[in-house]
């Protein structure tokens, strides 16, 4: 697992529908990955070395996700590797391609910069 600490996303709060639009515009998909208290946005990277996912999670600071009216507080982004058929692993021994890490960092920075204009 690679945890992007001090990414500029930790603790940032934004309205759910705005956050959904922003994340989708950057290629991160929420789809069915939510419950009433939290959301998960994923971006898939397919490389020769394998399939990797950038994951940005958040919790509902106000409201609930199911109603579509919530303020989400973001957490540190994670990078994990997908293993068929088990799913995404976030183990400490994972190795990540430099290009995936570089793209993930740039994407996180871009999202953090956009959130500065609307955070609650």
Curated annotation (Swiss-Prot):
Q: What is this protein called?
A: Uncharacterized protein YlbA
Per the UniProt record, the lineage of the source organism begins with: Bacteria, Bacillati, Bacillota, Bacilli, Bacillales
Q: Which domain of life is it from?
A: Bacteria
Q: Which InterPro entries match?
A: Uncharacterised_YugN-like (IPR014967), YugN-like_sf (IPR036491)
């Amino acid at each position: 697992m690679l945890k992007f600490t001090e990414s500029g996303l930790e603790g940032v709060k934004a309205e759910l529908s705005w956050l959904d639009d922003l994340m989708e515009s950057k290629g991160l998909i929420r789809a069915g990955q939510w419950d009433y208290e939290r959301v998960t946005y994923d971006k898939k990277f397919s490389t020769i070395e394998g399939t990797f996912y950038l994951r940005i999670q958040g919790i509902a600071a106000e409201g609930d996700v199911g109603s579509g009216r919530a303020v989400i507080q973001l957490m540190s982004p994670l990078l994990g590797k997908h293993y068929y058929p088990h799913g995404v692993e976030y183990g400490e021994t994972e190795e990540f391609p430099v290009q995936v890490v570089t793209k993930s960092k740039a994407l996180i920075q871009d999202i953090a910069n956009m959130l500065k204009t609307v955070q609650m």
